Amino acid sequence: MDLKTKMMISIIVPCLNEEEVLPLFYQALEALLPDLETEIEYVFVDDGSSDGTLELLKAYREQNPAVHYISFSRNFGKEAALYAGLQYATGDLVVVMDADLQDPPSMLFEMKNVLDKNVDLDCVGTRRTSREGEPFFRSFSAVLFYRLMQKISPVALPSGVRDFRMMRRSVVDAILSLTESNRFSKGLFAWVGFKTYYLDYPNVERQAGKTSWSFRQLFFYSIEGIINFSDFPLIIAFVAGLLSCFLSLLMTFFVVVRTLILGNPTSGWTSLMAVILFLGGIQLLTIGIFGKYISKIYLETKKRPLYLIKEKSDLPDFTEKNKVKRL
């Protein structure tokens, strides 16, 4: 397929308080995209921003009919924003990228070129080869998370993988068919399969503004990823319970034998309290793990929508073909 073949490319951009960096992002894309010689559609998703992000999106919409925006009634999270963007995107190729310019717009050319030259490919993803500019502990934690996921999850999650990718319509339709409320897009992209080629690039620092992701949020997001794509925590709970039971039986046997042979029972409140606290800690750990999985089931049974729209540009409702209905 030639690069000049006319097709629609939808670019989905989740936004949360991106007032400072959004003009730089939009200008960078507008300067590059005409060279693609293809029809472009922007789908900006305002995830309940409290700054001037929505006003900027409205201004871009007035200037450019290719710009569409969706504004949530509150902050529902990046996963909901990605899902909404995928639902409303109409392109033959769909791009997901962040507005902070850490996803280099110039890579769109290479992505499309790879797909055009390899008709058997369904998706071009991206991976960061370095994390320069990030705090050491945050970078170390990210590397540890990916290594852990590769060990405990049946789904292959490449180290450093980003949400930044270009997908064919077939991949998007497959992702939209997954209707769970608790979403972890990196895992979902991998779970649906399809042939994916990864482009590597070094870390790019945020160009303006501040990230909305704190370390605490990233930590709990990683927990969501582990819970959603692995039963390993349940195995840990089972093994911990089995081990504590074995140790308790062993200690009981030791106390009984010592009493029968030496004639004096083992004394000492310190050792007794240590054992009680240890077993209590194991119990609380396992209850917490079970509770986390049960809470996931509870949230799914509510069948609440992933997001609510406060306002949007004159985007048509997503077509019946792509509309996901809950059973």
Segments from the language model and where they lie:
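Generic structural signal for secondary-structure transition and capping sites
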Residues: A31-P34, V94, D120, S153, ...
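Structured catalytic core of nucleotide-sugar glycosyltransferases
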Residues: M1-G133
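Acceptor/aglycone-binding surface of glycosyltransferases and processive sugar-polymer synthases
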Residues: A66, F72-R74, K78-Y88, P105-L188, ...
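Hydrophobic helical membrane-anchoring modules
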Residues: D2-M8, R131, F184-L327
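Residue-level signature of catalytic and energy-coupling elements of molecular machines
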Residues: L29, G85, D100, L148, ...
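Amphipathic alpha-helical segments that mediate coupling or scaffolding at interfaces
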Residues: P14, L32, Y60, F72, ...
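Short conserved micro-motifs on helix faces and helix-strand junctions that flank
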Residues: P14, F72-R74, V119, R165, ...
